[in-house]
Amino acid sequence: MSLVLEVKTKNYLDDLLSIKKSLSHMETIVEEYNGYVLSESELKFGWTFFKLAFKPNLQNGIKEKFSDMLNKYPSSDQSQKFAKFMIDYFQSRGCAAIIKAND
């Protein structure tokens, strides 16, 4: 099953660009392209919300390439480990959006 992250931001254009650049970099590292889908954005109360869904090819490529790092996350749930890894990755690349795993 593909992971879906929920994203909320007050600076949609900057954070969207940051996420797209980060994902492009990740796709290059794992050599899997067109590996994600972004939903339409929705504006509520000054926040912009959208979802980021990973396609299996990119998700599996990341899991294989970064398995040692993913295993360091304390959760026994593999999808939660992957979500936390990606959230940390986006933050390390300068993304200021609030990101959480879709429950």
Q: What are these language model-derived features?
A:
Residues 27-36, 90-95:
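Short secondary-structure junctions
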Residues 1-4, 45-49, 92:
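A general secondary-structure signal for short beta-strands and their flanking turns/coil
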Residues 31-76:
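Short, intrinsically disordered low-complexity segments
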Residues 1-23:
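Short, extreme N-terminal segment that most often corresponds to the first beta-strand
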Residues 4-8, 51-53, 98-100:
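Ser/Thr- (and often Asn-) enriched beta-sheet segments in non-cytosolic proteins
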Residues 17-25, 60-85, 95:
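Extended Gly/Ser/Thr-rich low-complexity repeat segments
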Residues 84-103:
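Mixed-charge, Lys/Arg-enriched low-complexity segments
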